[in-house]
């Protein structure tokens, strides 16, 4: 596995975990670079700005993955997913972390400081670093479909999807 370039970010609700996880990442031999996009100890930058900055670094190739922390991890994942080409997930258990990479090729992991303990967060990040998506896997075609939906949305501004039919029940 090629050493990873990781970008980290948090809002004020995830600052303490971000700092601990950033130190763990910097000490991990699988990581060659850690870039912190905020927040600082006394900052209150809104999480969408932090998530967007981190996701942009992944999308444009300046980082391989991003680790984001807020209160729940949910807002960070939602905001990061607004960047074309990004697949961000919130995961608070080992199986979800594993499948996020192996099945979905997610490049962004969002954690919630108010949801999991620090030692579990540390374990999940260590596990996350060990997974690498296999472009020849059975999941590759599904990930390619996700990428195609992303491109179609970016190109046309319209949502693509299946045809739907509405039926009214009763009279």
What residues fall within each predicted segment?
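Short helix-capping segments at alpha-helix termini
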Residues: 1, 25-33
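C-terminal binding/interaction regions
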Residues: 4-16, 94-171
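Short, solvent-exposed amphipathic alpha-helices that sit
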Residues: 16-27
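Short, well-ordered secondary-structure micro-motifs
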Residues: 18-20, 45-49, 78-81, 121
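Short, high-confidence coil segments that cap the C-terminus of an alpha-helix
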Residues: 31, 62-64, 105
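A short beta-strand-loop structural module common to alpha/beta enzyme folds
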Residues: 32-44
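Helix-adjacent hinge/juxtasegments
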Residues: 50-91
């Amino acid at each position: 596995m090629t050493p990873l370039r990781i970008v980290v970010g948090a809002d004020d609700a995830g600052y303490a975990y971000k700092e601990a996880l950033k130190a763990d990442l910097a000490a991990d031999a699988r990581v060659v670079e850690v870039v912190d996009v905020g927040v600082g100890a006394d900052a209150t930058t809104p999480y969408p700005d932090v998530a967007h900055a981190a996701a942009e670094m992944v999308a444009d190739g300046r980082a391989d993955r991003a680790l984001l922390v807020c209160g729940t991890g949910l807002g960070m994942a939602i905001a990061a997913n607004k960047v074309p080409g990004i697949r961000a997930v919130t995961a608070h258990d080992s199986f979800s972390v594993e499948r996020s990479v192996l099945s979905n090729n997610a490049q962004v992991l969002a954690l919630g400081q108010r949801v999991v303990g620090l030692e579990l967060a540390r374990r999940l990040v260590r596990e996350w670093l060990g997974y690498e998506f296999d472009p020849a896997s059975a999941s590759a075609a599904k990930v390619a479909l996700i990428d195609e939906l992303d491109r179609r949305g970016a190109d046309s501004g319209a949502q693509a999807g299946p045809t739907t039919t509405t039926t009214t029940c009763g009279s």
